[in-house]
Amino acid sequence: MRAAWFALTSVIAVAGCAHTPSASNAWTTGPTFAPMAAATATGAFAATLDGSTTKAAPYTIRVHITKGGKILPHTHPDPRVITVVDGNLCYGFGEAFDPEACTMYPEGSYFLVPGNVPHYGYGKEDAVYQESGVGPSAFVLVPTK
């Protein structure tokens, strides 16, 4: 009897979690990447997977940084969660771009970048990562000293 009750409540719990995708998050073959602005990055490409950084709502961006690519030091007003999807991500914190001081995050890594904290990326090798946050957001380049 106890096993039957567990099975029934499990089915009800799973059924209650069912979700029908809306048109905005329906299955696609993959994101379309565009080069990041030349003033902020070289060898880096970004695609918006869901939402928009300009709206007061959740968003997810996927970034591909190529070997030798750079994303210059910058901040965002909102905290962001980073997930490394492919490769090893070289990610650093601070106002000066220093590829020797960055930390290598292997595929599967997950970490938080607090809002208004300067950070940068470097392509010691190709890597793909995702950034998720809640907008509105901005990309604020740290002035070169």
Whereabouts are the PLM-identified features?
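Glycine- and acidic-residue-biased ligand/ion/polar-headgroup-sensing regions
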Residues: 66-69, 75-96
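Conserved short histidine dyad/triad with adjacent acidic residue
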Residues: 56-76, 104-105
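A short, N-terminal "cap"/entry segment at the start of jelly-roll beta-barrel domains
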Residues: 18-59, 102, 144-145
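Double-stranded beta-helix
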Residues: 100, 120-145
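Extracytoplasmic
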Residues: 44, 56-60, 79, 116, ...
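Short acidic-glycine-tyrosine-enriched beta hairpin
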Residues: 68, 89, 95-116
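C-terminal motif of bacterial Sec signal peptides marking the signal peptidase cleavage site
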Residues: 14-16
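Bacterial N-terminal signal peptides that target proteins for export
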Residues: 1-7
